[in-house]
């Protein structure tokens, strides 16, 4: 785990727990086991992933956290692919809020009441500004 991320967690007073997933080599895109490494009992847990497609992994991870005593589970993903049956899975999971960005258009038939959509427009605008002013785009992600 990168030192910078550990330092970021220390700054905001958070602890790290890791969910180890195992893939079944005989089944494509399917995880089978989720092990929670770290103390989550009585805590609000934030699941972070790069994307949420069918939401199988995310929802299984949320169930594992609740099984280990998590008080609340919030999930965040940069790219909301949301292929079927993602909406159904999320709506029937212990995930209280799903936070995603607008890097992809969300289909009109997707109904996830607990979903919060954040715009990446300010980040893109700042990146363009940095490029035109000979600044650093990398600095936006530090």
List each language-model region with its residue ranges.
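PRPP/pyrophosphate-binding module of the type I phosphoribosyltransferase fold
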Residues: 10-112
